[in-house]
């Protein structure tokens, strides 16, 4: 028998629970037996699969082929070194990926939804994942239902279950037994995980958690999409394949030229050795040209970016989002809780006899009535731990009562509640019956415009009087005055009723006596002002999209600097009235959208995307999911539903607009740093190729062995390239216009930088080889290798910025670069040790005089890079 066929007592018995809830010990036992209330994640890629993936890179495959050929030819040391280096590279990439995965998993837990649960007779708020079968959970309007369950106490509950049933209308719920087997949409005494409470209140008994819930049974619908490569990684992979073919062609050409030279110069005496040398020359070019560390460096820098963002309260759900975020040109943000503190505070009240003022004297009948209405017609409370429970607006009212010296619990104890009619979005009212000073009294609170029309009398000068048109006008004028200040206004009324009145109906909310108004505000977050200004400076348009009133939204928008002179504010209805052409014409001028629907949100996003703008959109509800999917960057609130989080690219753990702008800034820095790493790697490789090709053309010996180049590319270069990924933001990172998503890898002068730096490194290596081979060809190779490794290492300082020279930056402002350079110099010194000299082709005669020349040439090359950078800066300034 299903829970919906059973009475409440039968379900309690079956789940071994009781009306007071479970004990902590029983909860622990059930969690140990059944696990937590969360859907199982997809099977993660195993460590072994990650390791194999690192070997699928086209550049790694070429190196593996080289290693096997060398092994076949008897070059055991060099082939072994290639295998070891590739193994180390793969292990580092796997470790970093696993570390990023585990930190992301830990951070995701921060954004878990919560549930109000009854345990041992006490109501408390817990993470929804800690729910067990048998728990009793309280629901109210706006709540996300955290598990499946049988309703046991219902007060006008309506739930939106469209995600499960396809029905667009909210379902009215009850607690009676249902006979026979019925479809999911007809189980009206049940609630289901991931549904939304539209209005009303209820308590339910948890009957299913995690995979056993209805949503758990269709969990594949909510599974996160497969991990995708970032656009940059796709471009690099495509470029890598093209580079691979070019390198193979170049190697074949060099090998052919070498063999041809052997025959034309009659150097065929030791043909096998000559062919082997020619092959190794070609291999050296392949090794020199391939940036072996590039793939892992990009992944590591992106992962570092995700960790930095997480510290700024922004959890990135995939790597492509980090890159896309840096291109954001439009941010569509909610108002409540994102731009504001989501902490409503009562700042004013209005009584017809006293005007606008704070309540201070409850000996006056009108003040006493107003404060009691605020506290009694109110479902919020504080837990024993001081935690806020309930709607933020209602919490503000009881907090106000406590603040002015009248504890809300005392007022409620003096006037106990006898019946209630919960708030709903159709009536825009809430009513209760309380035993107030020995008289059954209905208290009503709601929107001023609605409540004014329900009143025919007003409490004035200590007695009930007619609510005349003049008095109504006075109230309406005060309501408008409050609204102009972006204050949220509630009106309060009451009506004495007979002692036999036990329940409320719609007709009871008429012929009321108006008491007064309260005004509250959700103040803007302090840091929002600077963040809006920073976004504007960065060429990012910030748009407020809210369900609040247009007047309130405009007032907040103007206050925080989001709305300027000439900007427009539209309601959802006004937006619906615009044609696509009219919307396109006015799009740039519209800064505020108020009272919007989910369909409106999608239309706004598409309108900006049609203008080729990269758009970020915030959201927290099930209805926001389509707009979050549509946006280039969907941003879910940490307090939002799992459906919204699933549709998003990023989760804000603090629901704060400031965190969005911080994440955009980090996204820009990450992309800049990846390009710095790319320029560093390709400049060094180009320098090596220039030296090799020059040696081939003029008939010198190959300036580098394949082992030397592998050592530089894989061991030496990867550490500085990663260190560049840790570089702080350039001063103007948030002063540039947003980057276009389709921007090429080498755009904005990056290719020019690579050509200049690569040429300087190559020329330095050529001169070094020329000086060295006056002693012997072996000395030329040793000096060229020394100059190349030192120039590429010291180039790290130049690569830190394309606009600022190292003297301005300072040598110690990036400790990671300093450590990387020190590490590389220490590594190089190892190659000069007696037992390693032979492996790295460094002759015994190589001493201080040769080292000083080689190192001096490397330093000169880097100084030239910095001089050219400064000259470029002067030209750009003028």
From Swiss-Prot:
GO MF annotations, alphabetized: ATP binding; ATP hydrolysis activity; metal ion binding; P-type calcium transporter activity
TM regions (residue ranges): 50-72, 76-95, 243-263, 281-301, 681-701, 704-724, 753-773, 779-799, 816-836, 845-865
Primary localization class, coarse: membrane
Binding site for Ca(2+): 287-288, 290, 292, 713, 717
A Pfam family of this chain: Hydrolase_3
Keyword Lipid metabolism in record: no
Enzyme class at the top of the EC tree: translocase
Alphabetized InterPro entries for the sequence: ATPase_P-typ_cation-transptr_C, ATPase_P-typ_cation-transptr_N, ATPase_P-typ_cyto_dom_N, ATPase_P-typ_P_site, ATPase_P-typ_TM_dom_sf, ATPase_P-typ_transduc_dom_A_sf, HAD-like_sf, HAD_sf
Regulation of protein activity: Inhibited by very high concentrations of cyclopiazonic acid (CPA).
Gene Ontology CC terms, in alphabetical order: plasma membrane
Reactions the enzyme catalyzes: Ca(2+)(in) + ATP + H2O = Ca(2+)(out) + ADP + phosphate + H(+)
Compartment(s) of residence: Cell membrane
Record: active site: 334 (4-aspartylphosphate intermediate)
EC nos: 7.2.2.10
Signal peptide positions on this chain: none
Presence of the UniProt keyword Cytoplasm in the record: no
Annotated membrane topology: Multi-pass membrane protein
Keyword tags: ATP-binding, Calcium, Calcium transport, Cell membrane, Ion transport, Membrane, Metal-binding, Nucleotide-binding, Phosphoprotein, Translocase, Transmembrane, Transmembrane helix, Transport
Family the entry assigns: Belongs to the cation transport ATPase (P-type) (TC 3.A.3) family. Type IIA subfamily.
Cited function: Catalyzes the hydrolysis of ATP coupled with the transport of calcium.
Protein name from the UniProt record: Calcium-transporting ATPase 1
């Amino acid at each position: 028998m299903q829970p919906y066929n059973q009475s409440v007592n039968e379900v309690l018995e079956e789940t071994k629970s009781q009306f007071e809830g479970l004990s902590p010990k029983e909860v622990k036992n059930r969690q140990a037996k059944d696990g937590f209330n969360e859907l199982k994640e997809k099977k993660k890629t195993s460590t072994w699969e990650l390791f194999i993936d690192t070997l699928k890179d086209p550049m790694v495959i070429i190196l593996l082929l080289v290693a096997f050929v060398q092994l076949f030819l008897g070059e055991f040391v060099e082939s072994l070194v290639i295998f070891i280096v590739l193994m180390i590279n793969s292990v580092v990439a796997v470790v970093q990926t696993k570390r990023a995965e585990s930190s992301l998993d830990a951070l995701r837990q921060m954004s878990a939804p919560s549930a109000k649960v009854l345990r041992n007779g006490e109501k408390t708020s817990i993470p929804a994942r800690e729910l067990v079968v048998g728990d009793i959970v309280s629901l109210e309007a706006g709540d996300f239902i955290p598990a499946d369950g049988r309703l046991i106490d219902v007060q006008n509950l309506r739930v939106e279950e469209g995600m499960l049933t396809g029905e667009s209308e909210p379902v009215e719920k009850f607690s009676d037994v249902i006979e026979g087997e019925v479809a999911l949409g007809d189980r009206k005494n049940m609630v289901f995980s991931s549904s939304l409470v539209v209005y009303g209140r209820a308590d339910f008994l948890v009957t299913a958690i995690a995979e056993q819930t209805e949503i758990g049974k269709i969990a594949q619908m909510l599974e996160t999409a497969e991990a995708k490569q970032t656009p940059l990684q796709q471009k690099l992979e495509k470029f890598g394949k093209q580079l691979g073919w070019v390198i193979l062609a170049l190697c074949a050409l060099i090998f052919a030229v070498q063999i041809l030279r052997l025959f034309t110069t009659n150097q065929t005496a030791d043909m096998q050795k000559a062919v082997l040398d020619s092959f190794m020359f070609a291999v050296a070019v392949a090794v020199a040209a391939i940036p072996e560390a590039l793939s892992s460096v990009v992944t590591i820098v992106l992962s570092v970016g995700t960790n930095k963002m997480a510290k700024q309260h922004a959890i990135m759900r995939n790597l492509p989002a980090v890159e896309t975020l840096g291109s954001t040109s439009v941010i569509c943000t909610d108002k409540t809780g994102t731009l504001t503190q989501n902490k409503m505070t009562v700042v004013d009240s209005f009584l017809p006899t006293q005007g606008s003022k704070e309540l201070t004297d409850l000996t006056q009948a009108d003040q006493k009535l107003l404060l009691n209405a605020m506290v009694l017609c109110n479902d919020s409370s504080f837990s024993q731990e001081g935690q806020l429970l309930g709607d933020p607006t209602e919490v503000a009212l009881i907090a106000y009562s406590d603040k002015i010296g009248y504890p809300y619990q005392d007022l409620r104890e003096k006037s106990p509640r006898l019946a209630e009619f919960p708030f709903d979005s159709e009536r825009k009212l809430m009513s209760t019956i309380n035993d107030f000073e020995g008289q059954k009294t209905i208290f009503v609170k709601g929107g001023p415009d609605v409540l004014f029309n329900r009143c025919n009398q007003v409490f004035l000068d200590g007695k009930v009087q007619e609510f005349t048109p003049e008095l109504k006008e006075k109230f309406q004028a005060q309501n408008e005055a409050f609204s102009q200040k972006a204050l949220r206004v509630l009106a309060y009324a009451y009506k004495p009723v007979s002692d036999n009145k036990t329940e409320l109906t719609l007709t009871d909310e008429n012929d009321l006596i108006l008491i007064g108004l309260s005004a509250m505000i959700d103040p803007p977050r302090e840091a929002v002002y600077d963040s809006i200004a920073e976004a504007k400076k960065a060429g990012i348009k910030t748009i407020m999209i809210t369900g609040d009133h247009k007047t309130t939204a405009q007032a907040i928008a103007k206050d925080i600097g989001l709305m300027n002179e000439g900007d427009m504010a539209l309601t959802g209805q006004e937006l619906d009235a615009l044609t696509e052409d009219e919307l396109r014409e006015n799009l740039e001028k519209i800064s505020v959208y108020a009272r919007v629907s989910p369909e409106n949100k999608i239309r706004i996003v598409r309108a900006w995307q049609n203008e080729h703008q990269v758009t970020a959109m915030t959201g927290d509800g099930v209805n926001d999911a389509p707009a979050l999917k549509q946006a280039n960057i969907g941003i879910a609130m940490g307090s939002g539903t799992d459906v919204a989080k699933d549709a998003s690219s990023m989760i804000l753990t603090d629901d704060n607009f400031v965190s969005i702008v911080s994440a955009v800034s980090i996204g820009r820095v990450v992309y800049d740093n990846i390009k710095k790493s790319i320029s560093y790697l390709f400049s060094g490789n180009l320098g090596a190729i220039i030296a090799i090709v020059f040696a081939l053309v003029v008939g010198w010996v190959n300036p580098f062995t394949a082992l030397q180049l592998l050592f530089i590319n894989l061991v030496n270069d990867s550490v500085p390239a990663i260190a560049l990924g840790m570089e702080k933001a350039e001063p103007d990172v948030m002063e540039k216009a947003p980057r276009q998503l389709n921007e090429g890898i080498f755009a904005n002068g990056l290719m020019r930088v690579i050509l200049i730096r690569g040429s300087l490194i190559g020329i330095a290596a050529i001169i070094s080889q020329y000086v060295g081979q006056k002693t012997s060809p072996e000395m030329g190779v040793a000096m060229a290798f020394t100059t190349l490794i030192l120039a590429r290492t010291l180039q790290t300082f130049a690569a830190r910025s394309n606009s600022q020279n190292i003297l301005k930056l300072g040598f110690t402002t990036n400790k990671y670069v300093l450590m990387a350079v020190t590490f590389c110099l220490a590594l190089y010194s190892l190659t000069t040790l007696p037992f390693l000299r032979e492996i790295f082709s460094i002759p015994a005669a190589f001493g201080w005089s040769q080292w000083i020349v080689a190192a001096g040439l490397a330093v000169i090359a880097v100084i030239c890079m910095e001089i050219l950078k400064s000259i470029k800066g002067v030209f750009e300034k003028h």
